[in-house]
Each structure stands twice: as C-alpha cells, then as structure tokens.
Amino acid sequence: MDSDFVPPSVSFQLPVIDFSDQNLKPGSSKWDEVTADVLKALEDYGCFEASFDKLSVELNRSVFEAMEDLFELPIPTKQRNVSSKPFHGYLCHNLYESLGINDANVLEKVNDFTQQLWPDHGNKSISETIHLFSEQLVELDLMVRRMIMESFGIENYIDEHLNSTYYLTRLMKYTSPPDDDDDDDEETKLGLRSHTDKNIITILHQYQVDGLEVKTKDDKWIKVKPSQDSVLVMVGDSLCALLNGRLHSPYHRVIMTGKKTRYSTGLFSIPKTGVIIDSPEELVDKEHPRIFKPFEYTDFLHFFQTEAGRIAQSALHAFAAF
C-alpha cells in the first residue's frame, strides 16, 4: 500500500488524446496515429486524458442530476445495492460513498439496479441516463483496449480478451470535509486513499469539483483537471499482469478541498469469473521474463482484502509475482 501521508502536489497537464474524429477506425492512418499516442501516454504515466465528444453537455448534466437524486436516498435504501463480489455494491467510508452497477451498458441491468432502490416502480429516467452514459464509455474502453493489444503485437487475442470481461459502473460521492471552527482556511482531507485499481481499464469522469491526483514514476503527485467533456483513462493491475509488466497501473487518490461535494463516475472493465489472467507467450522472452503467475481476478480481490494485501506496497506483486 502506498503511504496515506498527503505530500504537496503540483498542477500538471497529462497527455490529451482526441477520440472524437469520425475517421478513427481500425486500420486507418488516424487510428495508427492515436494508437501511438495512447501507447506513449500509458508507458509514461499509466493514464491519459481522453477527449470524447459523445459525452455531451446534456448527458453530463443528466448524470450529475441522477447522482444527486441517488445519493439523497436514505442509507438503508442505498444499502439494498448489494453484490456477492468484493467492492461491487454500495460502499461508504469516511468522506466517500459509492453505488455500483454491473453491466450498466445493458438497460435491463440498470433497471434491476433502480428496482432495488425503488421497488414499486424503479426509475426509468435514471436508468436510461446511466445506461446511455455507460454505453458511451464502453465504446471508448473497447477502442483503447484494442489499441493496446495491437501496440504489443497480440492482436490475435483481441476478441478473446474483449469477450473475457464485463463492466462495472460506479457512481461516487465525496462529501466536503467538516468545518474547522478554529481555522478559516480551506481544509484539505483525503477523500480516497492512495491506491492502484485492480481491474483492466478504468475510465473516470469528475463533475465540477476537482480532487483527483495521480502519482508519476518519479513519485510526484500531480493534480488531474480534465475538462468537462473529457475523461481519465487509466491502466489497472490486471492489465499490467496480462501485459507482463509492459505498462504500469498508477497510484491515484482523491484530495478534498473546500466546502463543495464532489461527484464522479467510473467505468471499470473487469475479468469475468473463471478467466485466468496470464501473459501471452509473445510478451515473454529473455529481455522480458515472465513476472507474474497466472491468477483469477476474484482471488486477487480476496487477497487485497486481507491485511497482507492492504499493507503491501504493490498488492499485485505480493499476490502474483514469481
């Protein structure tokens, strides 16, 4: 686990990559250009800012309003959002609160979620909003993962890889820190401790209030301030393992400053139950010996829940490294 100590951070512009071009199709010169940019950004930072015009102002506003309505529900109601899988249902810890929806790119699954919270009638408007939003992010996720596989010469595994995952859409709320009666200055607190994501790819979108920070390879914390029509695309530990360590999953955290509540969304591509994460032979050679043992994602999550997993500098290496 990375330290929860909050060192100073600096403002920094991560690479911004445009995915809005209508000519962005596999095999096109534009595709090759963007693929090269994606690889460079992920090798350098483990993440990048993606400009994606399908996240319209109207859609972003609708998602924001839906989250306000959802988090205003009583806690016992939100606790109906349950899952047998770790870190998938309703979560609440200190300043952080979150709801999770499996396969939110499928409308029926979102309807099941709203039916949990409104048993009598569900919530058609919220269901349609979350479904449309998730659909758009899934489209971006699929493009990015295809580009990554092509970059490392393992395009023969693309269909197998894309079919081996499902999606979790997470809606997140970070409450502003409590007032300090003895200090008029803005108070800064850790909204979400430093961590790496355990899945394949994460796509994060924050609304109006910033707070996300990413740790660079040289151990500097940088403030991430994407525009309202862009998202942060980030490598997870499972992708790092699949690629035999060719890309890294960056530490990131949320710092709460001031008195405004922060809302954000996350789309997580996750290996399905029973799928074994193992580097293809094409990525293993004398210069790149195999780093990780094959493993199942759920076993990795269960390890992360143990004391050994929580205190490890890298849960992935502690769990799966040779």
UniProtKB/Swiss-Prot annotation:
Keywords: Dioxygenase, Iron, Metal-binding, Oxidoreductase. It is an enzyme of class 1 (oxidoreductase). Probable 2-oxoglutarate-dependent dioxygenase that may be involved in glucosinolates biosynthesis. May play a role in the production of aliphatic glucosinolates. Binds 1 Fe(2+) ion per subunit. 2-oxoglutarate binds at residue 262. Its EC number is 1.14.11.-. The keyword DNA-binding does not apply. Belongs to the iron/ascorbate-dependent oxidoreductase family. Fe cation binds at residues 195, 197, 252. This is Probable 2-oxoglutarate-dependent dioxygenase AOP1. InterPro entries: DIOX_N (IPR026992), IPNS-like_FE2OG_OXY (IPR044861), IPNS-like_sf (IPR027443), Iron_ascorbate_oxido_reductase (IPR050231), Oxoglu/Fe-dep_dioxygenase_dom (IPR005123). One of its GO terms (molecular function) is dioxygenase activity. Residues 165-271 form the Fe2OG dioxygenase domain. Its cofactor is Fe(2+). Pfam families: 2OG-FeII_Oxy, DIOX_N.
